[in-house]
Amino acid sequence: MPRTAYSLLFAALLLPTLAHCGETIPTQGYTVVRTYPHDTAAFTEGLFYLDGYLYESTGEMGQSSVRKVELETGRVLQQASTPAPFFGEGIVAWHDRLIQLTWRNQRGFVYDLATLTPRTQFSYSGEGWALTRDDSSLYMSDGTAHIRRLDPQTLQQVGSIKVTAGGKALDNLNELEWVNGELLANVWLTTRIARIDPASGKVIAWIDLKALVPDADTLSDPSNDVLNGIAYDAEHDRLFVTGKRWPKIYEIKLGE
């Protein structure tokens, strides 16, 4: 999301909350296993790994797209533009469909997963930020502390999870990934990923990726080019993270 005018204000309001939460919630360590190239023109809004490839949704008005990417080289193998004036957001795959949210238009798009050819559209209330899935449901963030649970066939909401950290609602939940029975969520305008217990909605640990943030002078727009993007290769237990217009994707290994 571009949100430049008020991003610094939100960050100022959010940091005290996270600092309070950090007093009682552990921060989990990690090591960087490997880095991969990432398109510095890609304003990453959604990311997932499937069958050896990354799938990415990029934002910005008139520049939004969905794409299939070769992990090792960063090469874009397939790409479909999101129609203007829609601002592309989170994506997820369900069987032969690629499902994409848009930011404020209350409209989503469904593509053929194999060809990225547009199939149909769907609607929802509020904003669309991110999508992920488990074996039976989709999960959607909308910038609030609530993660919606969607029926993957109808794309209608069937439940929700209120996310709390240290007893307080945790707003600005952004990119999501389902990892080993937990929800991982980027917290917009921070360098933290929240590990969330989906049964209780409680944040059980933070992953602070501050050390991975590129130097400001290497980013085209440091206030907006923030941490966002989580993908998981379940078969090989590989976790990938990146940010908007970052030059690298990081494969990280979480500590015990």
Please provide the spans of the model-predicted regions.
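A short helix->beta-strand "capping" segment at the edge of beta-propeller domains
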Residues: 23-40, 71-75
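A short beta-strand motif characteristic of beta-propeller blades
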Residues: 32-37, 75-81, 117-122, 159-168, ...
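Beta-rich, blade/repeat-based domains predominating
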Residues: 40-51, 84-95, 124-136, 141, ...
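Conserved beta-strand positions in repeat-built beta-propeller and related beta-rich domains
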Residues: 56-60, 98-105, 140-144, 185-189, ...
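Short loop/turn segments that connect beta-strands within beta-propeller blades
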Residues: 70-74, 112-116, 152-155, 197-201, ...
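Hydrophobic, well-structured mid-protein blocks that either form specific transmembrane helices
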Residues: 108-166
